[in-house]
Amino acid sequence: VKSSNYPLYGDMSSRVMKIIGEYSPVQEVYSIDESFIDLEKLPFNLMSHMQSLRQHVKNWTGIPVCVGVGSTKVLAKLANRIAKKYPRFDGVFDIDELPYERYCKLLQSVEVGDLWGVGRQSAKKLNRIGVHTSYDFYQSDVGVIETLLGVNGKRIHQELYGNSCIPMESIPPTRKQIVSSRSFGCDLKDFDELNQALTNLTRKAVNKLNNHKLSTTTITVFIYTNPHKKDKPCVHLSKTIGMTSAIQDQSQIIPLVSQILRLIYKPGYSFYKGGLVLGNLAKNYQQQDLFSMNQNSPSQIIECKKSNTIRSVNSKFNESIKYASELGNNKWLPRADFKSNRYTTSWGELLII
């Protein structure tokens, strides 16, 4: 069993997504290992086109992928499930080519909770009214589904009939919040150790904020004790503050996170997890507080330039500049005794042949 290696995973994911994007003019990167592409109106044989995609990804990255083809997102996800499960389809399956009788049999073999978009809680609601399989869901009255699961449930139901209701999002929607959290390598009691961890997590969150050209007006900080240790009390501590004007500068956000942590910190407890949430996100050009005397002051402009310089240096030289509160014994870092090398992102860990 290997420890997590997020730099390698992220880099390989971006390589795979770039290759997939070459096979369609419209691509939606759904997650680190999933992507939707629009195949409509392409002047190719879809099956051979997708086999070429699979081979391209395999040859250039060594990663095997499967492709599900369908007229809607829900059908494409269902087709992908079949492509993975049955080797005879050679990694590509077009669900729209199934005769109706076989399509119904397929739905009967898939539990409703395994449908894309139907979560665990929604599946429990459906089970209570006798809907256990995807076929039961398919045969259910759309009005009942909408009453039980809302408009999202209705969309999933309609997509099983081939009616596209969940559009492609080639431009990701604006984030509503950014969460940065971590289970620590060992339980932390000392405030400075917690502050070191939170400062590091804050800088990562602010980097995401800046990469998406967003700003925030609310900050939530939380720390938890380990709920699995039955001999000790389970404590969840958190606090949210709001600002009158949006901020995006790490020189402003890091001190605020430290202040919030000091407000909620309780000596004597051992905390195993912590993090922060940057909420109420908006584009950087949002209207500032008209009554603030400090906006665009010389000191603010200097701090902003300083932070931009630090971020630029860190992006080029592997996070070489750190805040004082980030320095310490690093006890909070997750254990990575069995981590594989960062073969594609670190000069010192290149694969030696």
Task: List the predicted regions and their residue ranges.
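Short regulatory "switch" loops immediately downstream of catalytic or recognition motifs
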Residues: 81-85, 223-227, 294
